[in-house]
Each structure stands twice: as C-alpha cells, then as structure tokens.
Amino acid sequence: GKLSRGLGDVYKRQILKRARSVTKNYDAFTDAANDYFIKGKGDLYDVKKKLYLSMINVNILEGLRFYVSFACTFAFGELKKMEGSAKIVSLIARDEAQHLALTTHIIKNWDNNDDKDMKKIAKECEGDIVDMFEQCVAEEKAWAKHLMKDGSIIGLNERLLGDYVEFIANKRIKALGFEPLYNLSLIHISEPTRQLA
C-alpha cells in the first residue's frame, strides 16, 4: 500500500543518487565517441581521456561500489540467515572480482606506454581518479549510514562499514599505483570480511 510506496520512493531516491556518479563518465565517453566517430566532431585525445575515466569508473564499480551491501549480505549468510541471497551475492562478487582484475590490467597497461596518449592522460587524470575514489567512499558511507539509521545489525555498524570501505578503497587505489587515501587500523574487521576485499 501507501507505506510500501513511500519506502520504495525513499530507496529509489537513494539508489538514483548513487547511480548518477556511476553513469556520468560512461555518458561522457559515449557522447564523445559518438561525436568523434559518427558525427566527425571533437578529437580522438578527448575520446581517449573519457575512455580512461570510464575504465577507472568500471574499476571502482567492480571493486568498491556496493561492498557495504555485500558485507551486510555476507554477515546474514554467516549467521545462517538469507543463505540463498548470500550465495547469489557471492557469485556476483566473484564476477566483479574478475572484472576488477581485467580493468586493473588494462589500466596498468595504459599506464605503461601501451598507448602514448593514455600514459599522458593517466598523469593528467590523477586528481580526477582520487576524487572518483573519494566520492565512491563517501557514497558507500552514506549508504551504510542509511542502512544503519535504526541501529547496528548482525554485528555491523556504520563505523565498521565505513572503515571497511576505506580499507577496500586503499587496496584498490594502491593496485593502480597510487598512495593509500586513508590512514586506518583494521583490528576490528573480521578476516572473512577482509578476504572479500
């Protein structure tokens, strides 16, 4: 009824808010590629730059986004609750790990002179990359806050999930050759949860 519609609207707003930062680089790339290859406008360097940022976006999508939700789902699974969902999400996480490895490999090849423009673009985009990671971390933390607004659940809380997201972000950005963004100790994060990262 009316209550479920209201809750649905809240979740839709939260999801749409998170989706905007996911899609903006893809949209910019497809627009630039369409302009250059179909309409004959723009320049190839701009297309490559937008491709590079889109690949970084895929890397973040596959390796950092939704990890708050993953952690919650796996916590339920460890408690023998919602085991079917936990199994399905584990398959999704495995698939995302493969995509993460692939995008990391592509980005590292570009950074190592696979394409002279891409190496230059990588250097130019360092600030953008850090901003993209920080934005994703902020959005994941906001999602954790939203999920935990009524209190902690199944041994998880907003702080723990926030630290976990920072831990994963550090791991992912280091794999791309950057310094860690966050200074934190993870004594309170369980080994199974660390392994997910």
Show which residues each predicted segment covers.
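Alpha-helical bundle segments that constitute or directly flank the non-heme di-iron/ferroxidase center
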Residues: 51-76, 98-102
